[in-house]
UniProtKB/Swiss-Prot annotation:
Main location: nucleus
Protein name: Cell division cycle-associated protein 2
Ranges of biased composition (kind: Low complexity): 931-942
One cellular component term from this protein's GO annotations in UniProt: chromosome
UniProt cross-link Glycyl lysine isopeptide (Lys-Gly) (interchain with G-Cter in SUMO2), position: 741
Biased segments, Basic and acidic residues type: 669-685
GO biological process per UniProt: cell division; chromosome segregation
Matches recorded under InterPro entries: PP1-bd
PTM-bearing positions, type Phosphothreonine: 309, 402
Region (Disordered), start-end ranges: 75-97, 192-216, 274-315, 400-473, 489-545, 568-638, 651-716, 910-982
Known partners and oligomeric status: Interacts with PPP1CC.
Residue spans of biased composition, Basic residues class: 518-545
PTMs per UniProt: Phosphorylated by CDK1. May regulate its subcellular location.
Gene of this entry: Cdca2
Amino acid sequence: MDASSHDKPLSESKECVLNNSENDVFRLGTEPFVTPQKHVADATPNLCTPDTFKSPLDFTTVTVEQLGITPESFVKTSSGKSTSSLQKARRRSTVGVRGSPETNCLIRFIAQQRNLKKAVLSPLAREPHFEGSPRLYRNASVLRERMSAFRSAFHSIQETKMASSPSAAEADGESRISDLTRKEDLLEYQQSGFPVNSSSKRRRISSQDSPDNYLSGTKALADEACAGGASTDLAEKSPDIGSAQPGCMAAPLPELRETSQGLAVTDCVEGPVTPLSSGTATATRSPETPMCGSSSPSAKTTATRSPATPVCGSSTPSAKTFVLRSVLKKPGKLFSENGKESNLCDDGAHLISYPSNSCKEGRAGRENCKTPGCLNPRKRKRVTFGEDLSPEVFDESLPANTPLCKGGTPVRPRTVKTTSPLQSPVHEQFLQPNFDDKEENLENIEPPQGSFANLSLSKSSLSETPPGTNTCSSLNKDEEIICSIVRPTRTSQRRKQTLSSTGVCSSYTTQAEPRKEKMSRRKSREKKHTSAALPKKKQVLKSYRKKKKGKKDVEKCFYGPRDIASKKPLLSPIPELPEVSEATPLADCTQGTSSDDFNKCGQLEEVNSFEIPTQRKRRLPQKADSPELDPAHHQSQVSDKCCYLLPLTTASERGPNASTRDTGSEGNTRAESKCQSAKEPKPGTKMESGLVPRASVTQDHIVSKNPKPLGSPQSQDLFKAGQNLENPCEILIVSESMNLKCEKESECLAPQGSLQGSPVSTDSKRDLNCSEDVLIQNIKEPASHSENVGRKCAGNGSPGSGRERKWRRRTVCCGGQSSYLEQNGNPASSCSGENFVEISLESVQLIEELSNTIEQSFQRTSSKTKVRRSTRLQRDLENTGLVWLSPSPSTLQKPRRRMTICTLDSRGFECPSSKEETISSGQNPGPLPAVSGSESQGVGSSALPRKRRSLCGSTLTDANSATQPPDCKRKPSLKGESAQLP
């Protein structure tokens, strides 16, 4: 709605409010409307009055209130309703609801306020500035609006220029010099087509957004200048603008420069003042062209000779060209020369002073004014990087840390080219910009200034070129070369493009190949630099990641070890450590067990370690026999038992150490006892010969007594499975199948009782000696002892003897076992001879497998038995290393061993239970029947009911003889033993 329309409703609203306050109830037409009682402040304006409806409504100006749309209209109901109900309904529906009168009034008020603000700030309000200033469109983000702004500005410029004469232009320039802050100056600048706004961003946006418009404007200006024949006027006007620049620091100097440059460029391009070479030079030197173009080509050459003239003229347009370069992308020569001149001005006040003096020669007043103006605006440019700066500007005045340097483009490795002024600075990335700019300036100023000539001595082309038109051509060539060298920079690339387009590329083409080479070299160097800098960035990223993620400060080089550390402790490394000690499992096991136990009953300790639950009950004598000569055999036995039975393995955790230790000391004693028992039983000597080194004395005795069933099949198979592992495997299997074997062996051992009798005596002695050690090592060696005794116990079925031997857990006596075999040998052999042969074959296979697995795992864990026992054995039987890790799991697993041994015993008892029951019951309870043929040690220990071999062996034999009662007895006995072990 228009402001007038808004004003009308406001005035009318007041009247309506008064009317409403007086008349709470009013009629719209004939219908009565009941309105709630309200105060004037609360009531919204109601313009709906009978008067308004009487007169015809002008819908162009009619308002909602006039039509009767009021807050009450939304709540209207029948007249019968009360005001309270109306109020409630109104509360529910209208207040705050879209379309409610309150909301509408608010929206209307806000819209009015905004309209007022826009009217005040709108570009239309600023009519004087609207004509030629694109600043009016600063709020406009559309390119079309900016283009139109530029067009309008250029049109105004054309009109002013056509109307103004050169004298008027000069007068305008003087007035600008006197006071540039005045609106006239601003309008003139705006007319020139450049925004009055001094911010580099706005200038850049305006210039970049409408390059075509700007070009068209410059062309129009050039046309006007040519038509008016006031090229000199324009040239003068441009310096006038330049002189005005020092006065107006606030005014956008680059804009003025751009205007002057644009005029000069258009003049030079359109006017045939000079040949193409000089024209190109002038095109490159927009300031010079106005200066020289106004007079003649000779004037241009003089301008080039006296760099002060181009410096001054170009100093202002050089900055202009900077903006124009980014916008119009003028030929590279213009950029290079103007850049050089501007670089001279930027390089320092002394440089500017010299050019100012030279300019004084040409135009003292104008140039003097221009030089300070150039200094100030250039400083501005140095400060403000918003504009697109030419590479020359960067080379001249900007520090090395300019944005271009960040990309690495300004950096130019100084390569082979020493002829071109830029080549030598190219070697030094940061020095190049300064040298290049100075050289370019020197090219322009060389002849007049000796210091510049000295600086440009490195640039032979510039120094060699004599001052004059030739200098202009040489300067143009040098500028072309410079542009080619400046490629890394964006402006330099633009230059090159412009140079190629202009066609002034004679020297450029000649030097194009070396430039390409240099560019390639530079690129390679830049790549190298970037590659060298990349690792630093990566390092920064590393540190940043560390800080960000909050992870521990670990270098990437540590990632591999870190991964290993982060990984959960693999089970493989645990067995690996025991594997390292595979060579020394005996020593480790002996260390695990007490030295006394090892010395006395090393082998018995092994047997006890495995036989802790069951073997201790019955296989005390067998334990002495079970420990084998070879410590590896004891380890294998322990490992076999552990693999066969998890509880036994836990027991074997202790056992393997003790068993290996016992194997060292008692292995020899057992070997002797085995040899004795082997000597006594000729049929068993076969088994003993194999078993003495490999199997424990129990097997030897059993073999001697049961040479055929156990000796040949079982013990030999055990030999095949592993000599060292035979006894443990037999014991493990004996816990299950060796019970049957022992029962059968007891049958076979019955005839061999006489043979085992002698070893019984020797074994009994050993068991007596070893009993103490076995008692000490009951905790450590129960597993290994349980292995050997397990087999022996299978042979010896008397549960009573198993219990007695329990107390003498490790007092394994081959003699006692042999006595067991002798005493129980006949019944055991009679009962379990046949079954034992069958079981021995099965057990041999099982024993072989178990022996292989147990040997590996047990040898691995032998070194670190204590540390890894518990977890490992619980999870994997093969990975016994974990079980060996900690001795505590061995104790925990002892009850398991008891249970398993008892179960195995019960299993073994099931087959030979009747046989061994008769044997064990017939014979003394301590000495289990020599049922376990391979466990002749158990037989020997059976002679000595105290001895520990009867633990597993006796339990097995008890199971064999009396399957259920011995099992029950064995389980409690195993429990008691386990209690004793800890």
